[in-house]
Amino acid sequence: MLGSVKMEAHDLAEWSYYPEAGEVYSPVTPVPTMAPLNSYMTLNPLSSPYPPGGLPASPLPTGPLAPPAPTAPLGPTFPGLGASTGGGSSSGYGGPGPGLVHGKEMPKGYRRPLAHAKPPYSYISLITMAIQQAPGKMLTLSEIYQWIMDLFPYYRENQQRWQNSIRHSLSFNDCFVKVARSPDKPGKGSYWALHPSSGNMFENGCYLRRQKRFKLEEKVKKGGGGSSASRNSAGSASTATAPAATVASTPQPQPPPPEPEAQGGDEVGALDCGSPAAPSTPYFTGLELPGELKLDAPYNFNHPFSINNLMSEQSPAPPKLDVGFGGYGAEGGEPGVYYQGLYSRSLLNAS
């Protein structure tokens, strides 16, 4: 009896364990694991551009593809799939990821190199640099354009805009004067040169900023530039060896003789290069080019923003300082005897 009772008790224990078989089958069956897979597969057609009709049929034949997918941390690692995987998840979630990375790289590709940056010089400075670097100290308009484009690659674009500004600067500034072509140099367009009294616009060869704006009216009112700026005939070349303040003579006779201190101002007034209706022509003829446009002896000044530092590798040879204007100089006289130079020292470092 006791054995039968024990057996019954054992049987009861086993039967009491069998009703809990549902709990045993629940982890074995892949039904709970398929639920997140189905949810993951249903999310793909929402974000991917493919039609939703073909995607439900695609996971059915690809049965063996399910084992690599059931990674337990699918939920937490799901937002990182777009950034971590560049090729697999780029169809659905990789669109904004590479766009953000590409957006960060965009500014690097559009940075303008330093060689093509806009130079910190005004148009008057560019024209002055071009004329000063010319061997004859005068250039045509097309030669000024070409010099600027060769030295600064920035001006190789939008040529019509800045070339108009160059023309306006040449026309509306008294520091630039037109030089007529001589018969021995035929061609199109007149030459442009610097006014003899405009040598103090820039300081020590630095073209970043002008000291003051050059105007002929101010020179006439002040009446003292310390040097002569008049144009003499070829017969007065013999008296040009004296200082400029004593050898200056007026091109037109005047009834009252000018005072010594006001003599320079009257002579500057004779150079009315801006008024086309003035009796004195605004063009320098072949024999009347002033000698002040010639450079003096070079000095060892090396400004960091000087044009010579920019042109050190591009200029093949320094300009000849003793040539002046070549064929435009005085006849039968020494090259440096015609007039005394205005500049106490040259604006450019010819070394």
From Swiss-Prot:
Alphabetical UniProt keywords: Activator, DNA-binding, Nucleus, Transcription, Transcription regulation
A GO cellular component annotation in the UniProt record: nucleoplasm
Which Pfam families does this chain map to?
A: Forkhead, Forkhead_N
Q: Which InterPro entries match?
A: FH_FOXA3 (IPR047366), Fork-head_N (IPR013638), Fork_head_dom (IPR001766), FOX_domain-containing (IPR050211), TF_fork_head_CS_1 (IPR018122), TF_fork_head_CS_2 (IPR030456), WH-like_DNA-bd_sf (IPR036388), WH_DNA-bd_sf (IPR036390)
The record, for Gene3D superfamilies, names:
Winged helix-like DNA-binding domain superfamily/Winged helix DNA-binding domain
Q: Looking at the keywords, is Nucleus present?
A: yes
Where is the DNA-binding region?
118-212
Q: Where is the composition biased (Gly residues)?
A: 83-94
Q: Does the keyword Aminoacyl-tRNA synthetase apply?
A: no
What residue spans carry the region label Disordered?
A: 52-94, 218-275
Where in the cell?
Nucleus
Compositionally biased intervals (Pro residues):
52-73
Q: Name one GO molecular function term.
A: protein domain specific binding
Question: Which biological process terms from the Gene Ontology are attached to this UniProt entry?
Answer: anatomical structure morphogenesis; cell differentiation; cellular response to starvation; hematopoietic stem cell homeostasis; intracellular glucose homeostasis; positive regulation of transcription by RNA polymerase II; regulation of transcription by RNA polymerase II; spermatogenesis
Known function: Transcription activator for a number of liver genes such as AFP, albumin, tyrosine aminotransferase, PEPCK, etc. Interacts with the cis-acting regulatory regions of these genes.
In Swiss-Prot or TrEMBL terms, this protein is called Hepatocyte nuclear factor 3-gamma
Q: Which gene encodes it?
A: FOXA3
